[in-house]
């Protein structure tokens, strides 16, 4: 049976409208796609990380409720899970502030086996973060070796536009790995100016 394996960030998004919090929901670029696939009944596995706190429990429970296998989610017992504050304007466009508390050694999990029938999803800043690059490449190399479909969701935010030149070799390497690339006009504008 075909499986979708995603690697990426999980975060609790707290949305603000008129400077008032309105809702808190788990999110993340790859995460959101996996939730939709899990709800549709697809066989979904997620490789990610959360803190061993109440927010981490909320995120893990949300994943399980939406059909996502969490066996490859690293839980850091003495850390806080990441959160983002999303301030929505009158057009519902968001301006983000991120708060993270990761250890220096990250994502110390065994990667799931990948078969030729699988689809591997990766993306966002998580896919180009130097501290995680070896783990991301480990999964991508497995996927490439067996002929799995590799889907790259660029999701390159304006907050990282000033780093685009420094990150470009990794971004281009991700393009080379990918069979399918998804990105918005804004993503590519942030990367290439």
Question: Where is each model-derived feature located?
Answer:
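Ribokinase/PfkB-type carbohydrate-kinase core domain
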Residues: 1-5, 62-64, 93-193
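Short polar catalytic/cofactor-binding loops
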Residues: 8-13
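Short N-terminal helix/helix-N-cap motif within the alpha/beta-hydrolase-1
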Residues: 15-16, 130
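Substrate-binding N-lobe of the ribokinase-like
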Residues: 3-4, 17-84, 88-93, 100-105, ...
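Hydrophobic alpha-helical segments and their boundary regions
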Residues: 16-17, 142
């Amino acid at each position: 049976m075909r499986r979708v394996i995603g690697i990426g960030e999980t975060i609790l998004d707290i949305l603000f409208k008129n400077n008032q919090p309105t809702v808190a929901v788990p999110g993340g670029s790859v995460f959101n796609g996996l939730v939709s696939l899990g709800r549709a009944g697809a066989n979904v596995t997620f490789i990610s990380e959360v803190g061993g706190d109440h927010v981490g429990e909320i995120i893990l429970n949300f994943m399980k409720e939406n059909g996502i296998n969490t066996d490859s989610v690293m839980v850091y017992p003495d850390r806080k899970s990441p959160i983002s504050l999303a301030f929505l304007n009158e057009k519902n466009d968001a301006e983000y502030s991120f708060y993270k508390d990761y250890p220096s050694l990250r994502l110390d999990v065994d990667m799931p086996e990948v078969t030729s029938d699988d689809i591997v999803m990766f993306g966002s800043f998580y896919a180009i973060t130097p501290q995680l690059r070896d783990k991301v490449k480990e999964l991508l190399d497995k996927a490439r070796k067996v002929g799995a479909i590799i889907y790259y969701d660029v999701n390159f935010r304006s907050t990282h536009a000033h780093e685009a030149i420094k990150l470009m070799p990794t971004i281009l390497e991700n393009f080379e790995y990918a069979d399918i690339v998804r990105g918005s006009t804004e993503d590519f504008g942030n990367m290439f100016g």
